[in-house]
């Protein structure tokens, strides 16, 4: 059975934690924006599955975890998982640990997609936005594209069985929150690339590692940029292009969420790097 749930823009739906019952093969959460362009707000601390599903889709909704304890939007702890999941045109906020955490092994997942999203305040209590805590049978693709990520803990923890990881045309900015590292790779994926992405922000004045350990032989940040207010501890962004100015020199008002480029920025990645919503 395929099910679509349609939500009205400008309305807040406080459903509490959700359990998807058995018998649903594909489930879509879709928002219809209000006349003012507002998305529906879905206040969902966590979602669990009763059995294996084919696909889960979120489109044009605001997902708010309410920082409800040590929460994950999806904390997959057994074989009841999806074959694919996608977030398109969404805003996602306030999940203390992860959006997606896989704490069981031998899963088969075709793809995990985030596209055209605004994501903030994730993984402040450890873990990361996407976490594979154990080896998997196969994960075809993990993709994060055309998105703005702010005040983030770790972005990804990767493990055995992942074929391809792509991050392209994103902005990653930490100002008030201090992460320790963005990427942890416990087992090298088949392919991994972070391209046309801008890393920015003072990280609350704290130095940090781009990666948990040294992956420089295979993990490159070609055609990506890093602002001068970032202070690297030990492991940096291999092959990244430094930008001579700070986040405030590059963006109009990053501390308040405006990542349009300043006309005075003289940024070589203009209209190629970063989230296209700000071009």
Predicted region positions:
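Glycine-rich repeat segments that build the extracellular carbohydrate-interaction surface of secreted
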Residues: 1-14, 26-35
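Extracellular beta-rich repeat passengers
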Residues: 18-258, 265-279
């Amino acid at each position: 059975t395929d099910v679509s749930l349609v939500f009205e823009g400008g309305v807040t739906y406080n459903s509490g934690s959700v359990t998807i019952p058995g018998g649903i093969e594909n489930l879509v959460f879709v928002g219809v924006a209000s006349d003012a362009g507002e998305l529906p707000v879905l206040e969902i601390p966590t979602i669990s599955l009763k059995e294996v599903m084919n696909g889960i889709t979120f489109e044009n909704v605001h997902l708010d975890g309410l920082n409800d304890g040590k929460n994950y939007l999806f904390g997959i702890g057994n074989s009841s998982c999806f074959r694919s999941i996608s977030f398109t045109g969404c805003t996602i906020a306030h999940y203390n640990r992860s959006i997606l955490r896989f704490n069981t092994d031998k899963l088969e997942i075709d793809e995990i997609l985030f596209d055209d999203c605004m994501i903030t305040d994730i993984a402040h209590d450890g873990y990361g936005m996407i976490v594979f805590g154990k080896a998997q049978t196969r994960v075809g693709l993990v993709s994060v594209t055309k998105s703005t990520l702010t005040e983030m803990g770790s972005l990804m923890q990767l493990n055995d069985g992942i074929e391809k990881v792509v991050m392209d045309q994103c902005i990653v900015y930490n100002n008030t929150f201090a992460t320790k590292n963005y990427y942890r790779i416990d087992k090298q994926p088949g392919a991994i690339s972070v391209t046309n992405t801008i890393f920015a922000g003072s990280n609350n004045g704290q130095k940090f590692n781009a990666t948990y350990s040294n992956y420089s032989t295979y993990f490159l940040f070609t055609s990506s940029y890093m602002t001068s207010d970032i202070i690297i501890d030990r492991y940096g962004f291999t092959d990244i292009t430094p930008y001579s100015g700070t986040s405030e020199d590059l963006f109009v008002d990053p501390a308040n969420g405006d990542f349009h480029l300043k006309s005075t920025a003289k940024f070589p990645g203009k209209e190629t790097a970063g989230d296209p919503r700000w071009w």
